[in-house]
Amino acid sequence: MRPSEYLGLKWQDIDWTRQTVSVVRSVRRLDGRWCFCDTKRSQSRRPIKLQRWIVALLRDVQTKASAHSLCLEGRDLVFKTASGHPIHADYLAKHFKMILELAGLPRIRLYDLRHSAATIALAAGVSPKVVSEQLGHASTAFTLDTYAHVLPHMQDEAAARIEAILFGEKA
């Protein structure tokens, strides 16, 4: 998901039974006010299947938010400030940078996590069409051009598969 999409998520966007989240809006600051806007393009409106550990984490966040009365009227955001307002993407990026520094990790942009997730999914053999839909891209070609980095083990695997076809061996 894009930062503007996950920062605009509301609890009603989560289907706990199907373990999906519906991306239906984005949030951004325009002229000093918060704007709940349409997604980047129509293809960006999509359901995304959540991994079980993410569902468990979100349930925990919801429980804690309810216990601290953070679900304010009209502000049913998943990610919000203590006053119930949306979190600014720049604020989130600043804190992400500080966490990386404290953990001694390389500096990356928060948006790079989107790239990493897409690359990992493709490397794991997830269909490019599925990855493209999860990312909200208009075309699978764009997804592959942007995220399908050739990892070293992929070259080895390709050579082994071709050799197996040519010589009738198991890859």
Q: What do these predicted regions represent?
A:
Residues 18-23, 109, 120-121, 132-150, ...:
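Short functional hotspots where side chains directly engage DNA or cofactors
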Residues 4, 9-12, 90, 116, ...:
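Structural detector for helix-capping/boundary residues
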Residues 1-27, 129:
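Short, charged phosphate-coordinating catalytic segments
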Residues 18, 27-54, 60, 67-71, ...:
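C-terminal secondary-structure termini that scaffold catalytic or DNA-interacting sites
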Residues 48, 62-133, 137:
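Short, basic (Lys/Arg/His-rich) helix/loop patches that form interaction surfaces
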Residues 13, 138, 150-154, 165:
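The DNA-recognition helices of helix-turn-helix-type DNA-binding domains
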